[in-house]
Curated annotation (Swiss-Prot):
Domain of life: Bacteria
Catalytic activity: (S)-4-hydroxy-2-oxopentanoate = acetaldehyde + pyruvate
Amino-acid positions noted as binding substrate in the UniProt annotation, renumbered to this chain: 14-15, 168, 197, 288
Keyword Cell division annotated: no
Gene: mhpE
Protein name per Swiss-Prot or TrEMBL: 4-hydroxy-2-oxovalerate aldolase
Species annotation: Escherichia coli (strain K12)
pH dependence: Optimum pH is 6.25-6.75.
Comment field (misc): Presumably stereoselective for the 4S-enantiomer of 4-hydroxy-2-ketovalerate.
NCBIfam families (alphabetical): 4OH_2_O_val_ald, PRK08195.1
Chain residues that bind Mn(2+): 15, 197, 199
Site feature (Transition state stabilizer) residues: 14
Function: Catalyzes the retro-aldol cleavage of 4-hydroxy-2-oxopentanoate to pyruvate and acetaldehyde. Is involved in the meta-cleavage pathway for the degradation of 3-phenylpropanoate.
């Protein structure tokens, strides 16, 4: 660590959207954002779970628009920067400008781990707006460390000043993380930061985040009570407690985060965010974590096991954006019974 302060990036109000089908109220957003700000996290990501303009038939409709959520959070923070997520092909540069006007100052431009080339326009435009611009390589387990580093280099070339290893499936272990960060560090400029976005499907979210920091990672994503897709993200309060034990500088108030997790976030969960049969299957099969609720709906509709659907999706190497294929897979399984 060399005494540097970690950048703590909260994702409760974006990845956490998946856990409650994108149904946060504006008052929920205000309360959670204020609590996070009071606890001194560095940034608070706010958007539909699938990023700007994710509210749709395919991904699920949100209770409010991205801009309403962003404005609600921006109104109550004094310290933290408001971040947002943009997936090229779902959100556009016009949506990004609107998010900036609503108060977002950080954007993470997210692509599948082998498709960084679709992010050029969005990264360049974010830099023109003066935003803190991050490249976000989703499903990072699905390509080799060397290929991931080449994709990271593309994003750096477009103007991203930080590149994330994103374990969207919660499928990686500590060795996988170390290999990817070493590859990125060898390829990127020394001044380009790196970040880690973990999911907890194999209960390794915190361990993988620690491994990333040990390899020189600058920014850590986490969420209160692990609120996120699948078994959730690295739980923020747990990561901070572990970082404290390691003597790392993080600048946040552990007890305030613990209170916010239990008092504000956990009561909102209509399905427990935890490692269980279905979420473990996600991590084991390497499936996009936000498929969970969609798979459970399809399983109930067609009289199937959600685990069987998830395992088949993993075999077919489905990636984020292919939510519409969940019903196809379910119908195939039913017809083959």
């Amino acid at each position: 660590m060399n005494g540097k302060k970690l950048y703590i990036s909260d994702v409760t109000l974006r990845d956490g959207m998946h856990a409650i089908r994108h149904q946060y109220s504006l008052e929920n957003v205000r309360q959670i954002a204020k609590a996070l700000d009071d606890a001194r996290v560095d940034s608070i990501e706010v958007a539909h779970g699938d990023g700007l303009q994710g509210s749709s038939f395919n991904y699920g409709f949100g209770a409010h628009s991205d801009l309403e959520w962003i404005e609600a959070a921006a109104d109550v923070v004094k310290h933290a920067k408001i971040a947002t997520l943009l997936l090229p092909g779902i959100g556009t540069i016009h949506d990004l400008k609107n998010a900036w006007q609503a108060g977002a100052r950080v954007v993470r431009v997210a692509t599948h781990c082998t498709e960084a080339d679709v992010s050029a326009q969005h990264i360049q435009y974010a830099r023109e707006l003066g935003m803190d611009t991050v490249g976000f390589l989703m499903m990072s387990h699905m390509t080799t460390p060397e290929n991931l580093a080449k994709q990271a280099k593309l994003m750096e070339g477009y103007g991203a000043t930080c590149i994330y290893v994103v374990d969207s499936g919660g499928a990686m272990n500590m060795s996988d993380i170390r290999d990817r960060f070493r590859a990125l560090k060898a390829e990127l400029k020394p001044e380009t930061q790196t970040g880690m976005h973990a999911h907890h499907n194999l209960s390794l979210g915190v361990a993988n985040s620690i491994a990333a920091v040990e390899e020189g990672c600058d920014r850590i994503d986490a969420s209160l009570a692990g609120m996120g897709a699948g078994a959730g993200n690295a739980p923020l309060e747990v990561f901070i407690a572990a970082a404290d034990k390691l003597g790392w500088q993080h600048g946040t108030d552990l007890y305030a985060l613990m209170d916010a997790a239990d008092d504000l976030v956990r009561p909102l969960q209509d399905r427990p965010v935890r490692v269980d049969r279905e979420t473990l299957a996600l991590g084991y099969a390497g499936v996009y974590s936000s498929f969970l609720r969609h798979c459970e709906t399809a399983a109930a509709r067609y009289g199937l096991s959600a685990v069987d659907i998830l395992v088949e999706l993993g075999k077919r190497r489905m990636v984020g954006g292919q939510e519409d294929m969940i019903v196809d897979v379910a119908l195939d399984l039913r017809n083959n019974k």
